[in-house]
């Protein structure tokens, strides 16, 4: 089989399963409205949970940062790309979340890959929730450490896996809020079991940070858990992009030596770090509290109005509200019908989610209004 035959076969298989991914160029993709092809849609696909991507205070901080520092960092943080803007942001993040150190990364994917690659060796073992994000599971699969998966949020299964002999160290990996189902991990129980077996816990809280907990401190703070490794990302609650790893001083020093994604990548622009500082200030403020409270109200309105639809509503209290349709083609058809009626919704299909669980992944944000939720419910009820 030639290279072209191999590529064509893979694409044909995706098409046959109604699982071929496509991109849509949009003029605006974050916030309340999505604009594409000169048409405006209510946007129920964005991860901009607090509606901060268009916040004037954050935009102004980025502009001023660009004027002060330029539009790029100029290099890796190990060469010339670590600015005072990066340093101050790291210090503010560490203070906010109660850690000794924070290290910035260009994306959550890079942060997860870097940490697992740097921390794990052949004699160690990774034990991950089976529904963990692709960045975590791919990093674990590429690691020299064996990977064991425990049933989703099943602490008893986790304990059994941890109890089996391991010559090295054990790292338990999970998410705070799961990206495709919107449910939360029982972090307190997971940490307790992990500690009983002398393991370390790594939590990716991409979808909880900024959105839940006191001052938006996220899932771990809400559940009174402090994992050894906490990954937070800035493309969701913060409304920007990038990520950080929160850890101890010793672990931070170690990652600075061995985390290749950090060492060999150009740092995020200092102007972006300034925008993230402004976003953090909003998240921690009374305005941040008001946005989170509004989001909770919108979620409650949606869940109350969708109960009688002939789809499975995931057990989620988060901004992620999946409607499980099951069949790939049915999910695609529903998403298209909703778009035709002014609601931009994304159909998520295998391999992103397990086979037979294709869904409409609906995301609500503080930028929405109650009438937007009512319109979404009206359209959903008209297409059931």
Swiss-Prot record:
<feature type="binding site">
    <location>
        <position position="21"/>
    </location>
    <ligand>
        <name>substrate</name>
    </ligand>
</feature>
<protein>
    <recommendedName>
        <fullName>8-amino-7-oxononanoate synthase</fullName>
        <ecNumber>2.3.1.47</ecNumber>
    </recommendedName>
</protein>
<dbReference type="InterPro" id="IPR004723">
    <property type="entry name" value="AONS_Archaea/Proteobacteria"/>
</dbReference>
<dbReference type="InterPro" id="IPR001917">
    <property type="entry name" value="Aminotrans_II_pyridoxalP_BS"/>
</dbReference>
<dbReference type="InterPro" id="IPR022834">
    <property type="entry name" value="AONS_Proteobacteria"/>
</dbReference>
<keyword id="KW-0093">Biotin biosynthesis</keyword>
<dbReference type="GO" id="GO:0009102">
    <property type="term" value="P:biotin biosynthetic process"/>
</dbReference>
<dbReference type="InterPro" id="IPR004839">
    <property type="entry name" value="Aminotransferase_I/II_large"/>
</dbReference>
<feature type="binding site">
    <location>
        <position position="133"/>
    </location>
    <ligand>
        <name>substrate</name>
    </ligand>
</feature>
<dbReference type="GO" id="GO:0008710">
    <property type="term" value="F:8-amino-7-oxononanoate synthase activity"/>
</dbReference>
<dbReference type="InterPro" id="IPR015424">
    <property type="entry name" value="PyrdxlP-dep_Trfase"/>
</dbReference>
<feature type="modified residue" description="N6-(pyridoxal phosphate)lysine">
    <location>
        <position position="236"/>
    </location>
</feature>
<feature type="binding site">
    <location>
        <position position="233"/>
    </location>
    <ligand>
        <name>pyridoxal 5'-phosphate</name>
    </ligand>
</feature>
<dbReference type="GO" id="GO:0030170">
    <property type="term" value="F:pyridoxal phosphate binding"/>
</dbReference>
<dbReference type="Pfam" id="PF00155">
    <property type="entry name" value="Aminotran_1_2"/>
</dbReference>
<feature type="binding site">
    <location>
        <position position="179"/>
    </location>
    <ligand>
        <name>pyridoxal 5'-phosphate</name>
    </ligand>
</feature>
<comment type="function">
    <text>Catalyzes the decarboxylative condensation of pimeloyl-[acyl-carrier protein] and L-alanine to produce 8-amino-7-oxononanoate (AON), [acyl-carrier protein], and carbon dioxide.</text>
</comment>
<comment type="subunit">
    <text>Homodimer.</text>
</comment>
<dbReference type="InterPro" id="IPR015422">
    <property type="entry name" value="PyrdxlP-dep_Trfase_small"/>
</dbReference>
<feature type="binding site">
    <location>
        <position position="352"/>
    </location>
    <ligand>
        <name>substrate</name>
    </ligand>
</feature>
<comment type="pathway">
    <text>Cofactor biosynthesis; biotin biosynthesis.</text>
</comment>
<keyword id="KW-0808">Transferase</keyword>
<keyword id="KW-0663">Pyridoxal phosphate</keyword>
<feature type="binding site">
    <location>
        <begin position="108"/>
        <end position="109"/>
    </location>
    <ligand>
        <name>pyridoxal 5'-phosphate</name>
    </ligand>
</feature>
<comment type="similarity">
    <text>Belongs to the class-II pyridoxal-phosphate-dependent aminotransferase family. BioF subfamily.</text>
</comment>
<feature type="binding site">
    <location>
        <position position="207"/>
    </location>
    <ligand>
        <name>pyridoxal 5'-phosphate</name>
    </ligand>
</feature>
<dbReference type="InterPro" id="IPR050087">
    <property type="entry name" value="AON_synthase_class-II"/>
</dbReference>
<dbReference type="InterPro" id="IPR015421">
    <property type="entry name" value="PyrdxlP-dep_Trfase_major"/>
</dbReference>
């Amino acid at each position: 089989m030639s290279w072209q035959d191999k590529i064509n076969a893979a694409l044909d298989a995706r098409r046959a399963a109604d699982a071929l991914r496509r991109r849509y160029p949009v003029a605006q993709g974050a916030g309340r409205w999505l604009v594409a092809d000169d048409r405006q849609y209510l946007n129920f696909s964005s991860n901009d949970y607090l509606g901060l991507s268009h916040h004037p205070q954050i935009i102004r901080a980025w502009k001023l940062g660009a004027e002060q520092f330029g539009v790029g960092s100029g290099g890796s943080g190990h060469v010339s790309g670590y600015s005072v803007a990066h340093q101050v942001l790291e210090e503010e993040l560490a203070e906010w979340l109660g850690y000794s150190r924070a290290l910035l990364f260009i994306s959550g994917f890079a942060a997860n890959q870097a940490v697992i690659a740097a921390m794990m060796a052949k004699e160690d073992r990774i034990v991950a929730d089976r529904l963990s994000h692709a960045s975590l599971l791919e990093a674990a699969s590429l690691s020299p450490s064996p990977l064991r998966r425990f049933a989703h949020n099943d602490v008893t299964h986790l304990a059994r896996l941890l109890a089996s002999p391991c010559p090295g160290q054990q790292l338990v990996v999970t998410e705070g809020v799961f990206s495709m189902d919107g449910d939360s991990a029982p972090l307190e129980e997971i940490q307790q079991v992990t500690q009983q077996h002398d393991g370390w816990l790594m939590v990716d809280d991409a979808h909880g940070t900024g959105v839940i907990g006191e001052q938006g401190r996220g899932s771990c703070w809400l559940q009174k858990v402090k994992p050894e490794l906490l990954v937070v990302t800035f493309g969701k609650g913060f409304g920007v992009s990038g990520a950080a790893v929160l850890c101890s001083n010793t672990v931070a020093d170690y990652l600075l030596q061995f985390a290749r994604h950090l060492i060999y990548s150009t740092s995020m622009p200092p102007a972006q770090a300034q925008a993230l500082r402004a976003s953090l200030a909003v998240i921690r403020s009374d305005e941040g509290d008001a946005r989170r409270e509004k989001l909770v109200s919108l979620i409650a309105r949606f869940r109350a109005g969708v109960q009688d639809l002939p789809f499975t509503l995931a057990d989620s209290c988060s901004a992620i509200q999946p409607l499980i349709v099951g069949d790939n083609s049915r999910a695609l058809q529903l998403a298209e019908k909703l778009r035709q009626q002014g609601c931009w919704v994304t159909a998520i299909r295998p391999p992103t989610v397990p086979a037979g669980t294709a869904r409409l992944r609906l995301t609500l944000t503080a930028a929405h209004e109650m009438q937007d939720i009512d319109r979404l419910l009206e359209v959903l009820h008209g297409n059931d």
